[in-house]
């Protein structure tokens, strides 16, 4: 099972406490191994503000010029990754902090020259992660990738999680601030097909970063040939059930 963490989760001690408590509860009761995938957009935005650097997004993806990729790598593969690792240590979970490039776990190529150092993620080699899981470690993987020519790349974490799930043949959960996809009245949609998603995007109900999230989930469901869950980390008591396959947010159907 791949669990992708997003939103302000990394900024909130209360949220991290809830999440890691749920992870401990799950691991005590269930055998299926977990892999954590994370971005850290809020953290990067804060850092950019402190350094007075512009934040530019194009179709929900962060434009990453050559003079910013080192900073973004430091925030995601450094601060965000090691913060999550620290929480795992605090909760007695044996974890290992990685990026997409470790063991070529996720293969990354440049996505679009106009976006700069932004990578496209595709399935890579499962060997390293499988070795760690077999030894009972929980991998925590940041969305920084490395191309074949050694360039660092910022990868959208939803898309990275999809490629990671494809690499491992695993189920995927996209955890964020929202309890799923909402309709025009703010009500949670329990199940979503590609047709329904296209309709809501055309109507302007699904917008901005949520378009990227929904498209990533649809791509994942199609490429994995299995449903993908979008859910909120806020419902901590429901998380162990979610990690065991019970939908609590929006289930994206292939």
From Swiss-Prot:
HAMAP family, per the entry: ArgB
GO annotation, cellular component aspect: cytoplasm
Family: Belongs to the acetylglutamate kinase family. ArgB subfamily.
Gene: argB
Known pathway: Amino-acid biosynthesis; L-arginine biosynthesis; N(2)-acetyl-L-ornithine from L-glutamate: step 2/4
Biological source species: Yersinia enterocolitica serotype O:8 / biotype 1B (strain NCTC 13174 / 8081)
Role, per record: Catalyzes the ATP-dependent phosphorylation of N-acetyl-L-glutamate.
Top-rank lineage group of the source organism: Bacteria
Name of the protein described by the UniProt record: Acetylglutamate kinase
Biological process according to GO: arginine biosynthetic process via ornithine; L-arginine biosynthetic process
Keyword terms of this UniProt record: Amino-acid biosynthesis, Arginine biosynthesis, ATP-binding, Cytoplasm, Kinase, Nucleotide-binding, Transferase
Predominant localisation class: cytoplasm
Assembly description: Homodimer.
Reaction it catalyzes: N-acetyl-L-glutamate + ATP = N-acetyl-L-glutamyl 5-phosphate + ADP
Record InterPro entries: AceGlu_kinase-like_sf (IPR036393), AcgluKinase_fam (IPR004662), ArgB (IPR037528), Asp/Glu/Uridylate_kinase (IPR001048), NAGK-NC (IPR041731)
MF terms in GO: acetylglutamate kinase activity; ATP binding
